[in-house]
UniProtKB/Swiss-Prot annotation:
InterPro entries: Arg_succ_lyase_C, Argininosuccinate_lyase, Fumarase/histidase_N, Fumarate_lyase_CS, Fumarate_lyase_fam, Fumarate_lyase_N, L-Aspartase-like
Protein name as it appears in the record: Argininosuccinate lyase
Family assignment from sequence similarity: Belongs to the lyase 1 family. Argininosuccinate lyase subfamily.
Record carries keyword Amino-acid biosynthesis: yes
Stored SUPFAM superfamilies: L-aspartase-like (SSF48557)
Protein encoded by which gene: argH
GO biological process, one term: L-arginine biosynthetic process
Native organism taxonomy: Bacteria, Pseudomonadati, Pseudomonadota, Gammaproteobacteria, Aeromonadales
Length: 461
């Protein structure tokens, strides 16, 4: 039976019921709905709606129901209930009779669903924080295992300057750290309970909403009933964090897809995260990474859809808000899956150290070192930049790397160049000079790795 049937003289059209019902997706809020109902029953005792004995019977029935839901959440989908709130109430009435009908006193589905969704977001957020840290740990472990590997750094997908594989991996650790921080901030902002705000104007019962909020694990209660039942900022904000983090993961995926190509050959992906072709037997496709890259659009699209659903909505609750769940559930599920898949990709990732070194030595990636050498000889940087550009053009013509040019060849472009230029053009020298904070000097990268290992160990502990 619908929770709102008394006002209507005829039943809903079956097509409308199918269109309107939300149980097929909001069943995922079952545990949170029961958790909120347990706390609400206690609050009703304090205002004299329920006796302690009645609350005890309801509590016992809800504990049994919670255990059943945890064991088999999909059982809920066998019901024709309108939504998860209707289903939980029907189960309680079946268990304790008319006593179950008293539980909704002073409560609306508007504040109820807002509470359920926030509780779900809190739990899912903690799970996602763990997945972010796990991926960071995977990146740090891979960086440590391949610390000696040098590879070319790119700008505009052109070889630019040598970096190390560890420095590359730590760049993504930094991105994920910002994702972690943003998620923590979002969880702090949603840590207020709307339960007790009723449909929109508050409840007529003197509920201690602060105590009620704390009982459910919130930091406190919301302050304005109109805002409380219509607020979906936390949904948009979590989707935004997911979208930005997925954008980071897409960059990670694209880098490794490129590094894994036959043309680059910098890394080899494990068979466990690749697939083959139904036609071409030689193929080993980076499907895990391509799916991460592709699913980014799905998550970003969900955020845009939610923003448009909320655009210009009048206060307070409107049925449009039912659109908050499917996109949110899918976005956070997808983000979680992609974080875990990215970590899996790293487990058996092989770095071709010789290939990466050869690539780092090619492409005139040491041209900046020659310019810095000229600056050290007293030539203004802009002039040095021009000299090196001309030198590179010549080196391309004679098909030599810079370090293989003879001294007379160098001196065609600047007489200040001496024999001491050659040590400056060596691969390790180019790394060693990057000593400012955040640079690729090996001692800096090692220190950054150690620091990351230490704070990740604290998280794991």
């Amino acid at each position: 039976m619908a929770l709102w049937g008394g006002r209507f003289s005829q039943g809903a059209d079956s097509r409308f019921k199918q269109f309107n019902d939300s149980l097929r997706f909001d069943y995922r809020l079952a545990e949170q709905d029961i958790q909120g109902s347990m706390a609400w029953a206690k609050a009703l005792v304090k205002v004299g709606v329920l006796t302690a004995d009645e609350q005890g019977k309801l509590q016992q029935a809800m504990e049994v129901l919670l255990a059943s839901v945890q064991q088999d959440p999909h059982q809920i989908l066998n019901s024709d209930a309108e939504d998860i709130h209707s289903w939980v109430e029907s189960q309680l009435i079946a268990a304790v009779g008319d006593l179950g009908k008293k539980l909704h006193t002073g409560r609306s589905r508007n504040d109820q669903v807002a509470t359920d969704l926030k509780l779900w977001c809190k739990a899912q957020g903690e799970l996602l924080l763990g997945s972010i840290s796990a991926l960071q740990a995977g990146l740090v472990a891979s960086a440590r295992a391949n610390q000696a590997a040098v590879l070319p750094g790119y700008t505009h997908l052109q070889r630019a300057q040598p970096v190390t594989f560890a420095h590359w991996a730590l760049a993504y650790v930094e991105m994920l750290e910002r994702d972690y921080s943003r998620l923590q901030d979002a969880l702090k902002r949603l840590d207020t309970s709307p339960l007790g705000c009723g449909a929109l104007a508050g409840t007529a019962y003197a509920i201690d909403r602060e105590a009620l909020a704390l009982d459910m694990g919130f930091g406190g209660a919301t302050r304005n009933s109109l805002d409380s039942v219509s607020d979906r900022d936390h949904v948009v904000e979590l989707m935004h964090v997911a979208s930005l983090s997925m954008t980071h993961l897409s960059r990670f995926a694209e880098d490794l897809i490129f590094y894994n190509t036959g043309e680059a050959g910098f890394v080899e992906l494990s068979d466990a995260v690749t697939s083959g072709s139904s036609l071409m037997p030689q193929k080993k496709n980076p499907d895990a990474l391509e799916l991460i890259r592709g699913k980014t659009g799905r998550v970003v699209g969900a955020q845009m859809g939610m923003l448009m659903s909320l655009k210009a909505l009048p206060l307070a609750y409107n049925k449009d808000m039912q659109e908050d769940k499917e996109g949110l559930f899918d976005a956070l599920d997808t983000w979680h899956d992609c974080l875990d898949m990215a970590a899996l990709v790293l487990i058996d990732l092989k770095v071709n150290v010789e290939r990466t070194k050869a690539a780092a030595q090619g492409g005139y990636a040491n041209a900046t070192e020659l310019a810095d050498y000229l600056v050290a000889k007293g030539i203004p940087f802009r002039e040095a930049h021009h000299i090196v550009g001309e030198t590179v053009v010549y080196a391309l013509e004679v098909k030599k790397p810079l370090e293989d040019l003879s001294l007379p060849e160098f001196q065609r472009f600047s007489p200040v160049i001496g024999e001491d230029v050659y040590p400056n053009l060596e691969l390790e020298a180019t790394l060693a000079k990057r000593v400012a904070k955040g640079g690729v000097a090996r001692e800096l990268v090692d220190a950054a790795l150690t620091a990351a290992e230490q704070w990740l160990a604290k998280w794991a502990g």
